[in-house]
Amino acid sequence: FATKKKQQVAISDSDSTRVFTKVPIHNHWESMELDEKNPKTLGWLQVAYWNESKKMVSNDVCASVIGFLKQKVLMDESSKIENVHLRCAYVNDEIYYDLGIRGWKFVKISANGINFVDYGIDSPFFTRTNKTGIQTIPNLRPDGNALDELVKLIKVPNPEMFKVHLISMFVDGLPMPCFAIRGHAGSAKSSTSSMIKRIVDPSGNSNDSNLKSFPHGEDNFVVSLSGSYLSAFENISHIDKTTTNMLCRAITGGAFEKRGQYTNGDVFSINIKRKILINGIDFQIKESDLLDRTIQYNLERIPKEQRLSEKKIEKIFQKLLPDILGEIFLILQKVLKIIDSVEDSLPHTERMSDFTIFGEAIYQSMGHKEGEFSKLYDSELKTYLQNLHDSNPIVKFCEEILGDNDEIEMTAEQVFKKISEIASRENYSDGGLPKSANGVRAWVD
């Protein structure tokens, strides 16, 4: 019975231990994971069997059947391996967006138009998690300029870059920079972060349901990312090298280890590429690899006379949201018309090349001239590097050691001695200075 019901079975290309299938439910199609521990899959099989046979079967029987079907697929060398999408898919020059509603309705964007479509046998494979919330139905005939109204509402300091960055989040499968939002109390960083999440990949209607704490350890990080297309991490205070490495791999796509379900020591590899947002009061991004993979937004504290209540902000946002989505989708339709020619016209870049290409196409589709986005993006990156340079205390010491020279050859021990002499003379006690010659070597590395 279960074998007849399942259609288009596929192994996930990002996690070779997971198997998905498409099944008919009432008058539409859905994807199910063949997992004997998944309550939704168990419930589907029990109800489907009852509807045809009027017989009840236990959870144990259903779990055995589903487990058998899964292993059969995994052991069959002819089984298809496919990308199983979450919320968004960019396939064959078309963008699919899962609205998260019952009945599995999607928005399909192509160069020729935008349509509301049903999920079906010919659709790309999608899955949903308990974090896949319902999205507002977009208004494809938006009134006014909703994106401009949004940036006024959140008072973002670099609005043109923000709009391009936000729209790029709907392009699945390609690395796009992380949102890095800083702001003290009263700057609305949490509200801003929640609105971004709710525009792209809502998990609910409140800040609490859309924002989460950064997880401890790589295993928890992978689990946290796996549940959402866009993960928004709240109140980041410090980004160490381990966190930097995990974020970089998740942004551009990389392999993470995953423990097997059994105590046999087996370790599997899971490939993760996700859209990410982080916010905090005053975290610093010190590694150039992560710096290249983020766009930073420093929100100013909003004066008391300009502050709005959460209820008022929510009312404005809810009114704007259908038009924001409609405007974004219409811009993406224009992007798909010109993306190939834009890619051919741009010089090769080593840093976030896919974002550079799509950013340029998005900016042109918003009415700007060719090449203007590349200048805007380069200016942003240079500002980040300059701020990193200015905020690093050792740089100022090295500049004094160099004096008028362009280059001096010194050992790490000699550099440490000089830094210590200058710090003592200037009564400088910043904890960011190297504590030894090895500290100098680590800083250089």
State the predicted function of each range.
Residues 221-224, 260-278:
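AAA+/SF3 P-loop NTPase mechanochemical coupling elements
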Residues 231-234, 306-317:
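Short beta-alpha connecting loops at secondary-structure transitions
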Residues 229-251, 283-292:
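Conserved AAA+/SF3 P-loop NTPase catalytic/coupling segment centered on the Walker-B
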Residues 201, 244-268:
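Conserved catalytic/switch belt of AAA+ P-loop NTPases
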Residues 5-26, 30, 37-40, 44, ...:
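DNA transaction DNA-binding modules
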Residues 1-141, 145, 223, 330, ...:
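N-terminal nucleic-acid engagement/recognition segments and initiation subdomains in replication
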Residues 286-304:
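A short helix-turn-beta junction within AAA+ P-loop NTPase domains corresponding to the substrate/partner-engaging
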Residues 113-227:
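P-loop NTPase catalytic core of nucleic-acid-dependent motor ATPases
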